[in-house]
């Protein structure tokens, strides 16, 4: 691919030993620090990660999404919103269509 010829791969094999969340953070920082890939302060990353819920002790799929306005090149864990995937997927049951998308934002905290 042409893209691969022009973009350096900064990923190190040692990063594979990091937790999935720390891999997301590292991947985000690497992408955000390469201005061939993203503009300063721009870019978005997300990942679905299996996590043990500290309250229920059940394994849950959590969707980590880079918050708006954060710098991808320096983002840390607190720069990601975390949403329970199952709850987030349930929002489709109350979705009323494109003209009502703004009202969905108020439901996001119910998915955290």
Predicted regions and their residues:
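N-terminal low-complexity or amphipathic/hydrophobic leaders
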Residues: 18-112
